[in-house]
Structures are given as structure tokens and as C-alpha cells.
Amino acid sequence: MKILVIYDSQYGNTEQIAKAIASGLGIAGEVRTVKISEAKLGDITGINLLIVGSPTQGANATIAIQEFIKNLPDNSLKGVKYSTFDTRMTNKIIRMFGYASPKIAKGLEGKGATQTVQPVGFWVKGRKGPLKEGELERATKWAENIANALK
């Protein structure tokens, strides 16, 4: 199985989660991890599973993640399974407007992808982090569960 993990990260927290997820997915096949600033549309060619993650900013994914998904050709993800994640803070106002991962999921479905599991969020202690204790382990376990479900 060919797996691609695409992420954006401002302070390194989402990058840490992306790498933990890639580690957990390693049991399912060949995993590539690509920061959105280095991602190309051709990176999706031939993949079976796409994982996309972003910090939550203004109740959405980063502009770079949004633009990447928007620029994918229609139906370019047909036959590709996907999961999404975000990093987020505990905050009543943010909770009211929502988080990045469900919005990323909607964009990927619009390009033909099929969801494997519900979008997930990983907690940071503040705007710049760090990650809350146990989140890296939770990310690895989340990815292992996806990998096992796809076997």
C-alpha cells in the first residue's frame, strides 16, 4: 500500500503529529511524509491512502492546505481512502466555529476520496504549543488503527 501524509505546521506541533502518524502507518506499507510547502499535485499519483493535517487557524485549515485541495483535479482522488487530522486548542470560541480536520475531509470527499475514519484533533496547550502530554502516542495509535483496518 502506498500512503501519503501531507501536513502544514506553523510551530512544529502538527509536524510532530504527522511524523507520529507516519510511524504508526508504517505497518501498512510505504509511507511518505510531505510538508505542504514541498507538496506537488503529482504526489497523489498512485497512492492508496492520503492523510492530511493542519493546525486549526480561524476555524479552518491553513491557506496552503486549502489551496492544495482546491487545486486537485476533480475526481483525482477517486479510489483513494483518506483520513484527516488537526492540532487545536481548548477554547469555547474556537469550538463554536469548528476545527480544521472536518473541513479538510469535506474538501477531499469533493475530489472523490473515501473516508476511512472520522476526522481527529490533537491538543496543544497554547497557540504555539507544546502538544499536550500523550498526544504523540495517541497519534501513533490512531494511525495503527487505520493501518489495521485497511489490512
Region spans (language model):
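FMN-binding flavodoxin-like domain, especially the glycine-rich phosphate-binding loop
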Residues: 3, 13-16, 20-36, 43-151
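Aromatic-flanked redox-active Cys/Sec active sites in thiol-based oxidoreductases
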Residues: 7-11
